[in-house]
């Protein structure tokens, strides 16, 4: 590719609405331009990287035995009504009517459409397992699109859907996709973690998210540096931090804590560790035609509630936070001084695992400006219902018993789910088993955010000059920067020869023949993030040398002119092989 025949739309300044590095750099590097909120044009530089991501994803999906097809972006409402997601999905689902007043949606995912294919085409267990995939544009009407391609409304996604006759088959399909994703993100040159996750709005029973590690990531990931354990913080099991409850050593005592409603303030006033205080959170579940059930969830003062874990407890699926009026009615005091001792009306108490093993702890006295110290289970309070209801935190024991938890930030770029029969039962996707009986198909679904990967890769690979692409997804692998291409025969002939050699070696190279000043050339290609640069100048050529600099290198080095192309090609092959 010659730069004079290519579109290079670099900018010196980022748009005012760009908040994070990837958004700023993708605009400045000429990769994207905004059309509307969360909707972008992908300019030639950006599209080249997209196509490289797609190629790696496609190769690994085919290698794993998945079969490519293409489903429509526009889907009839009837399919979504069958699955139940027409009502469940919410305003993110873009709905519209055609000229005949029929309801349609622009697909954010394709579970309904692919299940419709399966129920019409798969009749026997002999036709399974089968795994369909596509790479296609999706649309989710995000309430607040931001961060460029990281949270856009229109995006490119690879989605795959497996169909199996039994649980063993589903487990095998899931394993193949999990392994394929590991290969994909490894080949993309990204630092990532596969984490156990909650299934969210897609539904299902078992899932993993694939996160690119980046400080700007929206998701908190709990992982163990000395083992393979990793999980989304919302899904990670929190083990008790106290192995065994100690015997009471203090008498229960009501203490004045004027104006001290927070655990931190109470601990400071009483000169005790924060870990001896209890945080009381009041939840409610509504009962038709009767007053609500009130729940008191008790956490250690330095811990945070995990609502997803709470929602999975019996009776708490549809919980909400109690109103201040309800709190006063049940506890006799407004929030800030609540506790399980002497409530005004009966409440259901749930203690986190760590709280259940605590002794001599401090709780609210259900009276403004007072707490109760020296509280103990069994003596002062009945034994509670015990559950894991908190988020893990740094320093907690790892659930696999192989170390302690650390926390990092991640950007979700892939997700694999075991859906089971969620969609096949709702939509009547059945097959005849070995005995001729109809059975619901077992499904899995597997997504990769193609365009989101670009943003995530940049968040992990940049400096003050611009993007630093991994070789596998760089728009170009090498840029040739000739000094005086249009003025020096020696420079032009050498640059053209290098270009031909690199093309013949299968290297994705661009020759900058625009006639720009060196500073402009270097700034453009450093901003765009091309991993390797060769500078061809008369002074160096007279000594038989060409200047080489990798995008991550602090200094340039000199290579023999006659072997420079081969040397750079070998560097690229080594990087791609790694």
Curated annotation (Swiss-Prot):
It comes from the Bacteria. The keyword Calcium does not apply. InterPro entries: aa-tRNA-synt_IIb (IPR002314), aa-tRNA-synth_II (IPR006195), aa-tRNA-synth_II/BPL/LPL (IPR045864), Anticodon-bd (IPR004154), Anticodon-bd_dom_sf (IPR036621), Pro-tRNA-ligase_IIa (IPR002316), Pro-tRNA-synth_IIa_bac-type (IPR004500), Pro-tRNA-Synthase_IIa_type1 (IPR023717). Its main location: cytoplasm. It comes from Burkholderia cenocepacia (strain HI2424). This is Proline--tRNA ligase. It is an enzyme of class 6 (ligase). It holds the Pfam family HGTP_anticodon. The keyword Nucleus does not apply. Belongs to the class-II aminoacyl-tRNA synthetase family. ProS type 1 subfamily. The gene is proS.
């Amino acid at each position: 590719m010659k730069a004079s025949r290519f579109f290079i739309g670099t900018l010196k300044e980022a748009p005012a609405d760009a908040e994070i590095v990837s958004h700023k750099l993708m605009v400045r590097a000429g990769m994207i331009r905004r059309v509307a909120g969360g909707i972008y044009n992908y300019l030639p530089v950006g599209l080249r990287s997209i196509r490289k991501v797609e190629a790696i994803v496609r190769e690994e999906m085919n290698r794993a035995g998945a079969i490519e097809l293409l489903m429509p972006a526009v889907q009839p409402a009837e399919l979504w009504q069958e699955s139940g997601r027409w009502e469940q999905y919410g305003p993110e689902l873009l709905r519209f009517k055609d000229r005949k007043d029929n309801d349609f949606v622009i697909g954010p995912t394709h579970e309904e459409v692919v299940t419709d294919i399966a129920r019409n085409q798969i009749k026997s267990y002999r036709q399974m397992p089968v795994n369909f995939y596509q790479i296609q544009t999706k649309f989710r009407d995000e309430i607040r699109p931001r961060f460029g391609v990281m949270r856009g409304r229109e995006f490119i996604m690879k989605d795959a859907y497996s169909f199996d006759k039994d649980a063993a088959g589903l487990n095998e399909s899931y394993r193949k996709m999990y392994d394929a994703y590991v290969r994909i993100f490894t080949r993309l040159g990204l630092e990532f973690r596969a984490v156990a996750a909650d299934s969210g709005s897609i539904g299902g029973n078992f899932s993993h998210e694939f996160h690119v590690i980046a400080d700007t990531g929206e998701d908190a990931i709990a992982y163990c540096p000395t083992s393979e354990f990793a999980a989304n913080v919302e899904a990670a099991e929190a083990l008790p931090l106290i192995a065994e409850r100690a015997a009471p050593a203090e008498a229960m005592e009501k203490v004045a804590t004027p104006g001290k409603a927070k655990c931190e303030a109470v601990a400071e006033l009483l000169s005790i560790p924060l870990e001896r205080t209890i945080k009381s959170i009041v939840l409610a579940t509504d009962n038709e035609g009767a007053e609500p059930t009130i729940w008191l969830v008790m956490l250690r003062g330095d811990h945070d509630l995990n609502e997803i874990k709470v929602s999975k407890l019996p009776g708490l699926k549809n919980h909400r936070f109690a109103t201040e009026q309800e709190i006063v009615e049940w506890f006799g005091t407004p929030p800030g001084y609540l506790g399980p001792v002497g409530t005004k009306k009966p409440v259901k108490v749930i203690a986190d695992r760590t709280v259940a093993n605590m002794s001599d702890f401090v709780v609210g006295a259900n009276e403004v400006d007072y707490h109760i110290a020296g509280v103990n289970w069994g003596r002062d309070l009945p034994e509670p219902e015990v559950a894991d209801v908190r988020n893990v935190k740094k320093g907690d024991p790892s659930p696999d018993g192989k170390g302690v938890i650390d926390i990092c930030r991640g950007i979700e770029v892939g997700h694999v789910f075991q859906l089971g029969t969620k969609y096949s039962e709702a939509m009547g996707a059945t097959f005849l088993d070995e005995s001729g009986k109809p059975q619901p198909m077992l499904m899995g679904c597997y997504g990769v955010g193609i365009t989101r990967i670009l943003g995530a890769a940049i968040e992990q690979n940049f400096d003050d000059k611009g993007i630093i692409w991994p070789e596998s997804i760089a728009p170009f692998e090498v840029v040739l920067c000739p000094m005086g291409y249009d003025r020096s025969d020696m420079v032009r002939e050498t640059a053209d020869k290098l270009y031909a050699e690199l093309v013949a070696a299968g290297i994705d190279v661009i020759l900058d023949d625009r006639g720009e000043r060196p500073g402009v050339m270097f700034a453009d290609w450093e901003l765009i993030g091309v991993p390797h640069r060769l500078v061809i100048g008369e002074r160096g050529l007279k000594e038989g040398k060409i200047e080489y600099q990798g995008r991550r290198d602090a200094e340039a080095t000199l290579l023999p002119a006659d072997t420079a192309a081969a040397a750079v090609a070998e560097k690229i092959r080594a990087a791609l092989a790694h």
